[in-house]
């Protein structure tokens, strides 16, 4: 007697697909990569599993964008702040949220600076907008609205990572007067002014072109199936973390940072990812860089960034007279979590330069230097596990 055929729910089907994808993925990448997966995992655990990445803000605000989308904003204000120092506004990147700035928020607040962080539309706890609103120009409008609501007066320092840097460029294009009158410094971190079709995603130029050509279409087709994808991702959690670590960082980081990054990336709705992926291809704010010529500018990026490589940062520096270019060895795209101490120090130096340059003619030439995080490199070497395939758990 034959058994009755059972129908499978999308969740159970997704879990099965997830397990299958994990197995297939491991088989595809081969024994060497499997060994690396578990070795990297042991190393990540050895580096620590501390997972307190929260900051208790002084104030939480909801800024309503011009099209009605609620934008989540957090304000960190030091005790006794009198407005004499500039407000630092941090804009995060694509598929991240304001949690990525945890180390910079802590350091800047401790140093006595007022800090504003916000979730871009469709990211974190901000609301979602219409599909056509997911473009860089709209993000610039959103940033302007945040400034109007929570930092309407006083000097500003605008820092942006990846798509957050593009957001700052969009604002510079739309409102050069704001930059001339109030913005005293800009930090452009692991970002690009255009030419994102050149991204190789760390898989070489040929495969990179394939991903760039077919990736947006694939995301569009997947976007109605968010629940199924979530089930698939849960089924291959360790493989997911492995590829997040490989694509986001250029050196070993604690497993807790990998998980934080994965949580932000995979917590972003597919519809949002798909819409922004299409608009990123058309991003070009090279001409807007000229509007930053009167400010102190920091350009900060890593040598192992597979998304916004040195080509992009060099192009930005060449377009902004006096910009400081800091190129970090052993650093990937999520550089503010990977090398927080280095970035924090560069932000402090940027603020110092901005204060010293008040009323002076903008510099005609900045400096370019490559740095190595020696403290982190020593820590990584001390905790590096021996070769082997003993599976690590955490």
What are these regions (language model features)?
Residues 123-179, 345:
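Active-site loop/oxyanion-hole signature of alpha/beta-hydrolase fold enzymes
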Residues 47-77:
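N-terminal cap/lid segment of alpha/beta-hydrolase-fold proteins
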Residues 292-293, 299-301, 305:
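Short beta-strand/loop motif that positions the catalytic acidic residue
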Residues 69, 74-127:
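Conserved HGGG/HGGXW glycine-rich cap/lid loop of the alpha/beta-hydrolase fold
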Residues 173, 177-228:
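Flexible "cap/lid" loop of the alpha/beta hydrolase fold
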Residues 222-291:
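Conserved alpha/beta-hydrolase catalytic His-Asp/Glu region
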Residues 8-39:
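Hydrophobic alpha-helical topogenic segments used for membrane insertion/localization
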Residues 4, 318-394:
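Catalytic active-site module of serine/aspartate enzymes centered on a nucleophile-bearing elbow/loop
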């Amino acid at each position: 007697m034959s058994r009755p055929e059972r129908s499978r729910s999308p969740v159970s089907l997704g879990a099965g697909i997830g397990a299958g994808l994990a197995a297939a993925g491991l088989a595809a990448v081969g024994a060497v990569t499997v060994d690396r997966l578990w070795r990297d995992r042991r190393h990540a655990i050895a580096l620590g599993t501390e997972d307190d990445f929260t900051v208790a803000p002084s104030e939480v605000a909801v800024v309503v964008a011009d099209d009605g989308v609620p934008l989540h904003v957090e304000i960190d204000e030091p005790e006794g702040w009198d407005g004499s120092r500039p407000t630092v506004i941090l804009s995060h990147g694509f598929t991240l949220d304001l949690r990525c700035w945890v180390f910079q928020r802590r350091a800047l607040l401790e140093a006595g600076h007022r800090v504003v962080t916000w979730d871009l539309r469709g990211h974190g706890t901000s609301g979602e907008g219409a599909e056509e609103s997911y473009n860089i120009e709209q993000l610039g409008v959103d940033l302007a609205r945040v400034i109007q609501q929570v930092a309407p007066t006083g000097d500003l320092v605008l820092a942006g990572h990846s798509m957050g840097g593009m957001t700052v460029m969009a604002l510079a294009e739309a409102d050069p007067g704001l930059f001339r009158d109030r913005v005293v410094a800009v930090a452009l971190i692991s970002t690009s002014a255009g030419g994102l079709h050149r991204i190789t995603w760390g898989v070489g130029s040929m495969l990179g072109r394939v991903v760039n050509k077919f990736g947006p279409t694939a995301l569009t087709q997947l976007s109605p199936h968010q629940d199924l994808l979530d089930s698939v991702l849960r089924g291959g959690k360790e493989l997911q973390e492995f590829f997040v670590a490989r694509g986001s960082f250029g050196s070993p980081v604690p497993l807790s940072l990998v998980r934080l990054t994965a949580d932000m990336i995979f917590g972003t709705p597919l519809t949002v990812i798909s819409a922004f992926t299409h608009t990123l291809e058309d991003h070009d704010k090279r001409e807007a860089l000229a509007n930053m010529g009167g400010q102190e500018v920091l350009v900060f990026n890593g040598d192992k960034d597979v998304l916004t490589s040195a080509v992009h940062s060099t192009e930005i520096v060449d377009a902004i007279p006096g910009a400081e270019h800091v190129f970090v060895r052993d650093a990937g795209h999520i550089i503010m979590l990977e090398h927080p101490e280095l970035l924090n120090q560069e932000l402090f130096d940027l603020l110092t330069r901005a204060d010293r340059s008040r009323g002076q003619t903008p510099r005609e030439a900045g400096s370019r230097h490559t740095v190595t995080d020696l403290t982190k490199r020593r820590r990584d070497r001390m905790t590096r596990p021996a070769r082997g395939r003993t599976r690590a758990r955490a």
